[in-house]
Amino acid sequence: VLLDFFMAFIIAIVCIAPKYGMGSLNLKTTFYMGRLYFKVPFRYQTLGIYYLQLIIFAIIIVFIFIHLAMLLSLLFRNEYVAEIIASMTAVSGKVLYFSMGMGFVYPLLQKLPTTYFTIGDSLSGNLSYLMDSPGWGFNAGIIPLILTVLVIELILLVICRMKKCC
């Protein structure tokens, strides 16, 4: 997974950098914190930190999808069903958001890893705007994602030990 991201990064740099340059990773960007009546409704971080957080989220989410598909294919013995269920988990965060009343379910959604699968919304503050609540950034999203990785890996380990398939 890491090799794929590294190769995509190299290809993007080779294609874009000669024409536009590398840019400055120290450029400050603005992110919305949640509510306008806060003392500080916006925060400013560098583009380099944003890209680092984006890469970390992307690697963890791809890792979750690959291992979730492996787990589901071991359980159902059917790759087609496993991929359908894994794809449905990708959109379940948005479905819960719209079906349970927009903005009123944030205590539940903040703990679900599928909420943070929309990486740009999570990191830019758009998720804080949608939920009308602060704290939907990188620090809040990394914990459910890491816990999901650990749970999936633990279940895979238990199933593989029981079935002796790995």
Which role fits each region the language model picked out?
Residues V1, Y51, Y80-E83, T89, ...:
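Long, contiguous hydrophobic alpha-helical segments, chiefly transmembrane helices and signal peptides
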Residues F104-Y129:
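Short hydrophobic, aromatic-rich alpha-helical segments embedded in or entering the lipid bilayer
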Residues A12, I16-F31, N78, F98, ...:
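Transmembrane helix-loop junctions in multipass membrane proteins, especially transporters and channels
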